[in-house]
């Protein structure tokens, strides 16, 4: 039997990436649990949680736990706080927040920080994700040029021009109608497929296996043979699969929360 290694920094044993059936638990997962599956594999989160857990236990050892906790002394202890800045790095003593709030702000959730070893936390009770917005953004002219001149273009992207010297209401209404019509045409022609949890799930499952394979020290050859044969996987490159997996691991898990179930 093959030896399954535990990834450095993890306090729990991930599934054996070689065994596709070990990932059957992901079938039918709602978006909130998919996001958790990628967050819990993030080494940064594992490290932050280990620090948080040790700090919390040290505070409890000194000040007690509810209902006998000395809240006044707890909240007067600098160890109960961490500085929150735009880049989430410590810088001075201003804008300090409670360490449980620091964890939630950094990683995108409300509620008490969860041990990455926890399977299937109850969404809304144990884990509540912070709202994620999908905002339009201005593209640099060089990016627009590459998109428009690339072979075949980029059908899922639409670049619109607005005359900012004129009223925007009519222009925005027109832009919405144009985008809706183009989306419908592209879907009908099969050039794009709307991303849903159901549509993306097979690829996400492969991404979880790829992350577990890398953490277990699997060779590129071994992992490629096992993972690139996954039906409905939209890449034939193990490097590309790992790139997708890393994107989900490093913050992309929050974008999952924007997708409809089906």
Segments and roles (model prediction):
Residues 1, 184-262:
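K/R-rich mixed-charge low-complexity regions
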């Amino acid at each position: 039997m093959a030896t399954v290694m535990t990834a450095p920094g993890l306090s729990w044993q991930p599934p054996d990436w070689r065994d596709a059936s070990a990932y059957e638990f992901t079938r039918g997962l709602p978006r909130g649990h998919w996001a958790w599956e990628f967050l819990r594999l993030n080494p940064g989160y594992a490290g932050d949680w280990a620090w948080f857990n040790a700090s919390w236990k040290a505070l409890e050892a000194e000040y007690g736990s509810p209902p006998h906790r000395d809240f006044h002394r707890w909240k007067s202890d600098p160890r109960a706080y961490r500085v929150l800045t735009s880049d989430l790095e410590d810088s001075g003593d201003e804008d300090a927040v409670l360490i449980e709030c620091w964890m939630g702000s950094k990683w995108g959730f409300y509620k008490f920080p969860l041990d990455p070893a926890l399977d299937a936390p109850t969404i809304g009770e144990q884990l509540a994700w912070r709202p994620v917005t999908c905002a339009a953004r201005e593209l640099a002219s060089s990016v627009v040029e590459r998109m428009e001149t690339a072979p075949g273009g980029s059908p899922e992207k639409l670049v619109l021009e607005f005359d900012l010297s004129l009223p925007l209401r009519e222009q925005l209404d027109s832009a919405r109608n144009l985008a809706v019509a183009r989306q419908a045409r592209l879907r009908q022609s099969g050039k794009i497929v709307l991303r849903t949890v159901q549509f993306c799930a097979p690829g996400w499952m492969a991404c979880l296996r790829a992350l577990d394979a890398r953490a277990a020290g699997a060779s590129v050859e071994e992992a490629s043979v096992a993972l690139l044969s996954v039906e409905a996987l939209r890449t034939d490159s193990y490097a590309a699969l790992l790139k997708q997996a890393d994107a989900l691991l490093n913050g992309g898990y929050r974008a999952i929360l924007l997708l409809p179930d089906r």
